[in-house]
A protein has these predicted regions:
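Cys-nucleophile CN-hydrolase/nitrilase-fold catalytic domain and related Cys-dependent amidase chemistry
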Residues: 20-111, 178-198
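Active-site catalytic loop in hydrolytic enzyme cores
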Residues: 95-169, 178-191, 261, 267-268, ...
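Residue-level detector of high-confidence beta-strand sites
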Residues: 105, 114-119, 137, 172, ...
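C-terminal functional modules
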Residues: 279-283
């Protein structure tokens, strides 16, 4: 696959829904609209499924959302989003594992194959969760992909782990309540595009709601490309305006042939091609 059309969607969690199924219908409609408009791969924001919280009667809202999504909605939702040659990163949702622990999990449909990615590094507000055990690399129609959830994109050790793994597309679902959070995610996503020589797509949660985690949200959709000669005449930074509400989309034509030609061309300063060196701290 030489080109991939990527749809990065914000999601306003404050838009009311009458039932859990109505909320899920809205999510599905956005994904299918993006597919119908030509997107191959769609990404939705972190914690968008916490929008189900108003339908949870039990005191522990996180576990309640986990049960509502995975037990009730997911068996009906999954078949609607399994489509050959199409993909979606369905935001994130609390997942209650057999060990009784909560994880912040991104459900991923890669054509007809299902996979997931758990968030690795947690904010102080995610004390009820445990971090995931590792990051998964996967291939979507021949494109080497990785999902890195919000704070994880800010961790340079993760970028070091991914060095040399052939990552072509990094996808970053995110949720933050401050402009500084938007800035941190954006600046670090841009850095990952340079360090790994790959394309990076980010999308944020928007809107206000009554929630233990996502009461206020701000953000945008953004895409970054490597700062290398092959991309000199290409847009290397695209973004929607920063917003506090509304559903917005950034559709990006990811030129993979250009990326692969760049990787095969020697003689240019490129941090993604430098081998890791053993270093020591001088004191």
């Amino acid at each position: 696959m030489d080109r991939l059309t990527l749809a990065l969607l914000t999601f306003d969690v404050g838009v009311p829904a009458s039932t859990p199924d109505a909320f899920a219908d809205r999510v599905c409609a956005q994904v299918r609209e993006a597919w119908d408009d030509g997107a191959d791969l769609v990404v939705l924001p972190e914690f968008l499924w916490m929008g189900l919280e108003p339908f949870v009667a039990e005191e522990d809202k996180l576990r309640g959302v986990a049960r509502l999504f995975w037990t009730d909605l997911w068996p009906r939702l999954a078949p609607r989003l399994a489509q050959a040659d199409k993909g979606v990163v369905l935001g994130t949702v609390p997942f209650l594992g057999p060990d009784g622990l909560l994880r912040n999990r991104a459900p991923i449909w890669d054509g007809l194959a299902f996979r997931h990615q758990d968030k690795l590094h947690l904010t102080p507000w995610e004390a009820a969760f445990v971090g995931g055990d590792g990051v998964g690399l996967w291939s979507f129609r021949g494109v080497r992909c990785v999902v890195v959830i919000c704070l994880d994109v800010e961790i340079p050790e993760l970028a070091s782990l991914l060095r040399g793994q052939g990552v072509e597309l990094m996808l970053v679902p995110s949720a933050t309540e401050t402009l500084l959070g938007v800035e941190r995610v954006g600046r670090c996503a841009d850095a990952r595009a340079v360090e790994l020589g790959c394309h990076v797509g980010v999308c944020h949660l928007l809107g206000r709601t009554t929630s233990v985690l996502i009461d206020e949200n701000v953000g945008r959709a953004a895409a970054f490309a490597p700062s290398q000669a092959a991309f000199r005449d290409e847009p290397r930074h695209l973004a929607t305006p920063v917003c506090t509400e509304g559903d917005h989309a950034l559709t990006v034509d990811v030129d993979l042939a250009l990326l692969r030609r760049h990787r095969a061309t020697p003689g240019e300063t490129d941090p993604s091609k430098l081998p890791a060196r053993p270093l020591r701290l001088l004191t």
